[in-house]
C-alpha cells in the first residue's frame, strides 16, 4: 500500500464522526485563508508608519486580527483533540471486539503480544495523524494553494524564489522517503520483537526467577534494543539531514527575498511595506513547508505499523462468518462426526477421517497419548477450527450452518487451564450466566465444592483472583472454572482434564457434582482418570490424529488393543481380557490412580 493510500485510509476512519469532522475542516480552511491576510496587514502597518498616516487604526486592526486568529485556532485545536481521542477509542473498541472474536488459529498464527502491540501502536499513530491533519495538514495545503497566486500577483520575480524553495523541499522529502522506507519497516519489526520479549518474560516471571534467568533475559532485551537502535539510527540520520537541508534552503530563500526586495525598493518598484509583506509570505510558506515535511516524517514512520494494522483488520473481516446465520434451536445433544479431517497449517498434525455418533445424554471419554488430537477434536466441536473435510452435526444440524454464538451457548467448557480473569471471584463465575442471582451463584459453587474456600477469602466473593488466577491455588482455580460451567447449565458439557489440579478428597466431591450435572446432558471428557473412563458410555481412543478404537470401557478392554495397553502402561494391573470361558467384567486394580 502506497503512502498516499495509507494516509487516505487513516482519514477514512473519521467518517464515524462525519459532521464534527466536516465542521472542523471548514473552520480550518477558513482560518488558512484568513491567515494569508496577516502579512498583508503587517505590510500596511509598516507603510503607514513610514508615511505617518493612520498608524494607530491600522495597528489596532492588525492586532485584533491576530488575537481573533489565535482564539479561533485554539477552538479548532480543542475540537480536533476531542474528535481524535473519541475516534481513537472507537477504533480501539471495534478492533478489540473483532480480534477477540477471531478463531483460535488466527491468534496462534499471530501471537497475543503481536496483535496487542499492533493495535495499540497503530491507534496511537492514527490519532496523531488525525490531530495533525485537522490542526495543520489541511490548512497547510489550502494556504499553499491560495498563497501561490497571491504572491505571483504581488511580484512574480520574488515568487520564483519561493517556488524554488518549495521544489527543494519536495525533492529532499522524496529522497529521504526512498532512503528510509525499508529501514522504517525494519524498525517496526524490531519494535515487535522488543515488545514480545518483554511480554514473554514478564508473563513467565516465576520461571525466570526460579531458574535464575534474570541476567540472561535482561541481556536478551539489551540485544533487542541494540537491534532496534541499529535499524533506527540510519532513519533518524536521514531525517536530521533533511531538516538541516530544509533549514539551509529556507535561510537562503529569505536572504534572496530581502536582497531582491531591497533592489526593487531602490528602483522604486516596491515599497518597504510590500517587501515586509513578501518576507511575511516567505516565512508563512517556510512554516507550511516545514509542516509538510513533518507530516511526511510522521506518515513514513507510521506506515509500517499502520500497514500491519490494516492487514490485521482485513483478516478479521475475511474470517468473520456470514451474517444472518440461523441459531441452533432447542438442543437435545445428539452429536455426530462425519468423516471429519482438520490439519493444522504448515504442519502434519491434526485429526483425520474421524467418524462417531453420540446419543443425547451420553458421556464420552476421549483418551490417547499426548498429541493424539484429543483437544483438537473438542475445538472442532466448539468451532474454534472448522473442518477442512467432513462436518459435525448437533441434532442432525451441520454446525457450520449456524452462528457460532448460538452454538457456544449450548456448550459449557472446563479447560485444563482454568482461564480466570483478573477480576473478582463473583465476576469470574458469573461469566457462565450474565445476571445470575446470588442464590444461583452459591448453588453452583457449592456443587463445585468451592463455596467453603471462597468464604475463607478476605472479601469472600468480591476477592480479586489476580492475573490468570495467580492469587488462588491450582485446585481453587479449577473449582471456580467448574462452578462457572455448572452455572451456565448448557445441554452439552466439555471437561478438558477438569479434575487434573484437584486433590483426591476434592476430586471425589467434584466428580460427584460432575456426575450429577452430567445427568440428561451430553458430556465429553478428556481425562486419564480411570474412574471417569470407566463410567463413560463411549470411549474414543485417538493416536496420531486418528480414531483407533471406540466402544465402551469393557469392550475396549476385551479387544486387548491400544486402550488396554495404555491402561497397563499407566501402572494399572488389569486382568486379561474376558474370554468365552470366563465372563468377568471386574477389573481389579493394584492402586487407584490416574493414568
Swiss-Prot record:
It is a multi-pass membrane protein. ATP binds at residues 368-375. It comes from the Bacteria. Its EC number is 7.5.2.3. Residues 335-569 form the ABC transporter domain. CDD domains: ABC_6TM_NdvA_beta-glucan_exporter_like. Residues 21-301 form the ABC transmembrane type-1 domain. The chain crosses the membrane at residues 21-41, 56-76, 129-149, 158-178, 252-272. Pfam families: ABC_membrane (PF00664), ABC_tran (PF00005). InterPro entries: AAA+_ATPase, ABC1_TM_dom, ABC1_TM_sf, ABC_transporter-like_ATP-bd, ABC_transporter-like_CS, NdvA, P-loop_NTPase, Type_1_exporter. The keyword DNA-binding does not apply. PROSITE patterns: ABC_TM1F (PS50929), ABC_TRANSPORTER_1 (PS00211), ABC_TRANSPORTER_2 (PS50893), NDVA (PS51317). GO terms for molecular function: ABC-type beta-glucan transporter activity; ABC-type oligopeptide transporter activity; ATP binding; ATP hydrolysis activity. It is found in: Cell inner membrane. It catalyses: [(1->2)-beta-D-glucosyl](n)(in) + ATP + H2O = [(1->2)-beta-D-glucosyl](n)(out) + ADP + phosphate + H(+). Involved in beta-(1-->2)glucan export. Transmembrane domains (TMD) form a pore in the inner membrane and the ATP-binding domain (NBD) is responsible for energy generation. In NdvA the ATP-binding domain (NBD) and the transmembrane domain (TMD) are fused. This is Beta-(1-->2)glucan export ATP-binding/permease protein NdvA. The gene is ndvA.
